[in-house]
Regions:
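Extracellular/oxidizing-compartment recognition motifs
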Residues: 1-332
Length: 332
């Protein structure tokens, strides 16, 4: 397929060990006639989330897939027809760093990788009606704005400021007059290929089996060591900051991350498997977008005692959505 090579980014700045750069949002408005069909092909380096007119389309977590962009660029295809409106429509995209820029991968020298750069996207939306086609690509009409994700890294985690949320930004009619124009950027040299791998999906939802107050915070135990993220639901005050540290073991009954905090050439790293949420006033509901962790235990810092409830955290167990083709049972 002739995949578009017109890549865009919000700008050349990108997250490093010395600076955090927010995940970018993008909007592309277009007009569609009544009765049209629509198809989208899209990639995001490293990861993307995509919506049409507020409908969340992304196939699964951490789309499209992991690859070295100078060798292979995975893209996805979506049928948009059921979400298409007559008149104004909005394609909305959010980008994360993924493996395209992974400063926390310094243990493997990923912070020195030759392909490192700011997250970028390329897409083509094709409208079809009465035998005619109209192509809408990643072009100079795409607008961009920083998201509430102040920092994201595949291994570190996310910093999310709920006070910076932009209600309605994925919908037509949103006021984007203060948004900037996205900038064209270099297209990676890799071959474009449709991703046919199974998407990452939530396979199980776990509640904590115990909650214990420790010296540094509240310890949530989910009873099994697996991979995923935590959904956070909390009522608090604007500006309150809570931090979730994800670990696999205890030492002397205390939360311990020594097995995953590699020191390497930079010394100890407090950001490994840490998600930070800065609250807005009132109810907050947050799930990380561009990271995942291996853990059984979560140490939550910054909570008031009344906030350390069973409902605070839910573990979303994430893995490839492989079809079940067999099973095994045995007695004890």
């Amino acid at each position: 397929m002739d995949f578009p090579r017109s890549f865009l980014y919000a700008g050349p700045q990108y997250t490093t060990r010395a600076q955090d750069v927010p995940a970018p949002l993008f909007r592309r408005k277009f007009i569609a006639p009544a009765g049209a069909q629509a198809e989208l092909v899209i990639t995001g380096l490293g990861f993307y989330e995509v919506w049409l007119n507020g409908a969340h389309l992304t196939k699964g977590f951490l789309a499209p897939y992991i690859s070295a962009a100078d060798d292979l660029i995975y893209y996805d295809r979506y049928d948009l027809t059921e979400h298409l409106l007559e008149g104004e429509n909005v394609l909305a995209i959010e980008l994360g760093n993924g493996f395209f820029n992974d400063p926390a991968g310094y243990v493997w020298d990923f912070d020195r990788a030759p392909w490192i750069g700011a997250p970028r996207t390329a897409f083509r939306l094709t409208l079809k009606k009465d035998g005619e086609e109209t192509r809408i690509e990643s072009d100079e009409q795409v607008l961009t704005h920083p998201s509430p994700i102040l920092m994201d890294d595949y291994r570190w985690g996310e910093i999310y400021d709920a006070r910076k949320e932009l209600p309605g930004w994925t919908l037509p009619g949103f006021d984007d007059r203060l948004w900037a124009h996205a900038m064209p950027c270099e297209a990676p040299s890799g071959e474009a290929r449709l991703c046919e791998a199974e998407p990452l999906a939530v396979r199980e939802i776990l509640k904590p089996v115990s909650i214990e107050k420790q010296d540094e915070g509240y310890l949530y135990d989910f009873g099994v060591d697996t991979t995923g993220i935590c959904r956070v639901r909390i009522c608090g005050h604007a500006g309150q900051k809570i931090a979730l540290y994800h670990g696999e073991k205890l030492k002397g009954g205390k939360f311990d991350m020594d097995n995953i905090k590699f020191e390497h050439r930079y010394g100890p790293d407090d950001r490994v498997q840490r998600d930070v949420l800065i609250l807005k006033e009132g109810e907050n509901d947050y799930t990380p977008t561009f990271t995942y962790h291996g853990f059984r235990y979560v140490l939550v810092k910054g909570l008031e005692e009344t906030q350390a409830t069973e409902e605070l955290l839910t573990m979303l167990v994430i893995s490839s959505a492989l079809p079940e083709v067999g099973g095994f049972d045995c007695s004890d």
